[in-house]
Amino acid sequence: MSKYLFVYHAPMTPAEATPPTPEQMEAVMGEWNAWAGKVGDGMIDFGTPLAGGVRVTRDGVSPSTREVVGYSLIEAADFDAALDLARSHPHLNMPGGCEIEVHEAQAIPGM
């Protein structure tokens, strides 16, 4: 089993989006919870919404060029299994062209 970081991208942060009605929020959270149930014991960290990212370099700090709106950390049998979970993720159904990046955690030699 390997660990995978899911990075959620969207054209706007949750705070910038039109607030959902309570019914819409309940439906969306139901989809996310159903997906988490599919991940099962492989869910290491469900994650949280993110906003206000910046890019830090030796030259200074600047606004992030890509909006990261959340993350999850999961464990899956292999990269293909992680991709299958990403393909079925409800984040992809959100309006505005939402995306998920999948990154495999790499072991650090000697640690």
What are these regions (language model features)?
Residues 1-111:
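Conserved, structured core segments of small domains
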